Amino acid sequence: MEKFTKLTGVAAPMPVVNIDTDMIIPKDYLKTIKRTGLGKGLFAESRYLEDGSPNPDFVLNKPAYQNAQILVAGDNFGCGSSREHAPWALLDFGIRCVISTSFADIFYNNCFKNGILPVVVSPENLEKLLDDASRGSNAVLSIDLERQEISGPDGGTITFEIDEFKRHCMLNGLDDIGLTLEHAGAIDTFEKANASVRPWA
């Protein structure tokens, strides 16, 4: 998993509450277990018109936001079913950070496992960040995970809280496999000791 230390990128405003995983990645794209290639299905029902052409009114289709790496979204982002395809689609599109006032628990945890940083801010700070993100290609935010700060285009900063263990995993690029490998030496020592006292096991 790619490390997340500091990200500076265009932030796209999506001030919609209760964006669920069905909206993030429709069921038609769930037939694969590959993590790549799902970016084309991200927000597909809103992003494309009936004829399959891009919807010019959808935020991620607008020239200023086509390379967005940050989403600033409404409350309760990622609610609905627990499909892990949702963070896969966000990551494949290029989104590395989602900022909201709250997230559905399963989606929130799945983000950390897939290298996406979900940041919780107050309603007041979300409004400020949405205003920043509405500046088009000038809507550049910097997310500093080490300092736990968001810097806006005007130079102002917003601090955020994050679980220390999750922060450690993101800073070091550790998914479940990476965490296991961190303790490979201890696991090997235990297995050798266990084999000597329980050779039948």
Curated annotation (Swiss-Prot):
Record-level GO BP terms: L-leucine biosynthetic process
Keyword DNA-binding: no
Domain of life: Bacteria
Top EC class for this record: lyase
Signal peptide: none
Bilayer-crossing regions: none
Known pathway: Amino-acid biosynthesis; L-leucine biosynthesis; L-leucine from 3-methyl-2-oxobutanoate: step 2/4
UniProt-listed CDD domains: IPMI_Swivel
GO cellular component entries: 3-isopropylmalate dehydratase complex
Amino-acid biosynthesis in keyword set: yes
Physiological role: Catalyzes the isomerization between 2-isopropylmalate and 3-isopropylmalate, via the formation of 2-isopropylmaleate.
Family to which this protein belongs: Belongs to the LeuD family. LeuD type 1 subfamily.
Alphabetized NCBIfam families for the sequence: leuD, PRK01641.1
Record's protein name: 3-isopropylmalate dehydratase small subunit
Taxonomic source organism: Agrobacterium fabrum (strain C58 / ATCC 33970) (Agrobacterium tumefaciens (strain C58))
